[in-house]
Amino acid sequence: MIVTTTQSIQGHEIREYKGLVSGEVIFGLNFVKDIFASVRDFIGGRSNTYEKAMIDGREQAQREMEQRARAMGANAIVGVSYGYETVGPNGSMLLISISGTAVVIE
């Protein structure tokens, strides 16, 4: 499945628009890991805990979106965008969302 942020796919013609598809993931991080990540962030280092969680979450949300597109009969998704938001008490959870338009290409 081709997934792109652009509205078209070079070398392919869009034959049919199937509709909007999305994938969402929400998760909280371990309390102890949060403390160490906060300390690392405070002293200026990178938080590998949060970076890995964001990468894993983004990949999971994209897989979910692709599955939904396949179920609609699509073989590509165009106009993809990601969103990130902290939710829950004290921003303790991260919501990652992805959406795009499911299409059939030649």
Language-model-detected regions and their locations in the chain:
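N-terminal presequence-like segments and the immediate start of the first folded domain
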Residues: M1-K33, A71-N75, T86-G88, S92-E106
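Short, well-ordered alpha-helical segments
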Residues: V21, F31-S81
